[in-house]
């Protein structure tokens, strides 16, 4: 996927507002823990783009993001 769009992600979440909250939670987690070895273009893509791409490609589910946020 060359570019991530909101439409790519809306199949995975209920509303755009949920998408914003979930993507920001995931991006903050990426920034806090650092980029993993499996993430491509870690120096070229910002954490928000990586988070949106993960959501769009179902690499991580909204439930997993919320669970990770609760667990800390």
From Swiss-Prot:
One of its GO terms (molecular function) is DNA-directed RNA polymerase activity. Disulfide bonds: none annotated. It catalyses: RNA(n) + a ribonucleoside 5'-triphosphate = RNA(n+1) + diphosphate. The keyword Transferase applies. One of its GO terms (cellular component) is DNA-directed RNA polymerase complex. Pfam families: RNA_pol_Rpb6. The keyword Nucleotidyltransferase applies. Keywords: DNA-directed RNA polymerase, Nucleotidyltransferase, Transcription, Transferase. One of its GO terms (biological process) is DNA-templated transcription. Its EC number is 2.7.7.6. Gene3D superfamilies: 3.90.940.10. HAMAP family: RNApol_bact_RpoZ. The RNAP catalytic core consists of 2 alpha, 1 beta, 1 beta' and 1 omega subunit. When a sigma factor is associated with the core the holoenzyme is formed, which can initiate transcription. PANTHER family: DNA-DIRECTED RNA POLYMERASE SUBUNIT OMEGA (PTHR34476:SF1). Promotes RNA polymerase assembly. Latches the N- and C-terminal regions of the beta' subunit thereby facilitating its interaction with the beta and alpha subunits. Belongs to the RNA polymerase subunit omega family. This is DNA-directed RNA polymerase subunit omega. The gene is rpoZ.
